[in-house]
Amino acid sequence: MLLSDRDLRAEISAGRLGIDPFDDSMVQPSSVDVRLDSLFRVFNNTRYTHIDPAQRQDELTTLVEPAEGEPFVLHPGEFVLGSTLEVCSLPDDLAGRLEGKSSLGRLGLLTHSTAGFIDPGFNGHITLELSNVANLPITLWPGMKIGQLCLLRLSSAAEHPYGSSAVGSKYQGQRGPTPSKAYLNFAQS
């Protein structure tokens, strides 16, 4: 069941759902708007010949931050990682879906490529997979509304929520845009 604005406020007031910093004006009828942080991970296209998910490639991305008051410019066809300004903490009976903002989608900005699901128990900044499918550059301003977080109530609390040792949570507690840890999904020899 998708939570309404009333339910979202009740979960936040009860301290079960954490959104920090929280601004009540960001609550929509069935979601909470989230904003863009100031850190981005840019791919180093000349460092590797290809991306291999089975290999740890620490220098695949570089963390960049625009100067104070300046935007990050996302060029056509470019893909970077960003993150929400807000730290989100979900209880073990709520899951989240990050959706893009319609107004930004109409400009050609994709907020996530594939990973819009947030497991119950997750705590941290939500990493954004930002793509520009327009044919002009798009300026991304730190602090701008970038997406909306929808919350869904599970039929029962998760037995092993994200962050528990049983599920191998790679991104619990992440701060800022976090690079892929896909290599951990492969058997290590």
Curated annotation (Swiss-Prot):
One of its GO terms (biological process) is dUMP biosynthetic process. GO terms for molecular function: dCTP deaminase (dUMP-forming) activity; dCTP deaminase activity; nucleotide binding. It comes from the Bacteria. It catalyses: dCTP + 2 H2O = dUMP + NH4(+) + diphosphate. Its EC number is 3.5.4.30. Pathway: Pyrimidine metabolism; dUMP biosynthesis; dUMP from dCTP: step 1/1. Keywords: Hydrolase, Nucleotide metabolism, Nucleotide-binding. DCTP binds at residues 101-106, 119, 127-129, 148, 162, 174. Transmembrane segments: none annotated. The record marks 116-117 as: Important for bifunctional activity. The keyword Nucleotide-binding applies. The active site is at 129 (proton donor/acceptor). Pfam families: DCD. Belongs to the dCTP deaminase family. HAMAP family: dCTP_deaminase. Bifunctional enzyme that catalyzes both the deamination of dCTP to dUTP and the hydrolysis of dUTP to dUMP without releasing the toxic dUTP intermediate. Homotrimer. This is dCTP deaminase, dUMP-forming. The lineage of its organism: Bacteria, Bacillati, Actinomycetota, Actinomycetes, Mycobacteriales.
